[in-house]
Regions:
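Positively charged, small/polar-rich N-terminal and surface patches that mediate targeting and assembly
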Residues: 1-140
């Protein structure tokens, strides 16, 4: 067993919304990209110059974000039952200091025009930190 730390991102999708497969894929992609944009903003990057080589030069080598960018971009999709459950996970991530990006769909193609919280991405962060938040959830 390796002592190397692993990084990952977990995307939690609300299953009570009964979204179509394509909608789920789009929402998960929004969440993953949103977390990267948050990371870039947090690190005060110029997005026009935010190529991976430049990002790697600015993020501490020991950070989970750098590990994630340099490795396999591990993403795992799991589900939760309700909006309240997702919001509780988001609060837990905030309390723990784990990067979290929530997605509120505009409602143009689903949800009868009502903006709706669909999912959240947790991380990239060290796997054990993300697991403390999402480890009990079932795979999507």
């Amino acid at each position: 067993m390796s002592n190397t730390k692993e990084s990952k991102q977990v995307i939690v999708i609300r299953k009570d919304l009964n979204m179509r497969k394509g909608k789920i894929a789009a929402q998960a992609a929004h969440a993953s990209m949103g977390s990267i944009l948050q990371l870039l903003d947090r690190r005060k990057y110029n997005l026009l110059e935010g190529e991976v080589m430049e990002i790697r030069g600015e993020i501490k080598v020991s950070s989970p974000e750098c590990h994630w960018l340099d490795n396999s971009f591990t993403k795992i999709c799991v589900s939760c039952d309700t909006e309240d459950e997702l919001l509780a996970l988001v609060q837990k991530a905030k309390d723990k200091g784990v990067l979290c990006c929530t997605i509120i769909d505009s409602g143009k193609t689903e949800f009868n025009g009502v903006p709706t919280l669909t999912c959240a991405a947790f991380g990239p962060a060290w796997a054990e930190d993300v697991d403390e938040i999402t480890g009990n959830l079932k795979l999507l």
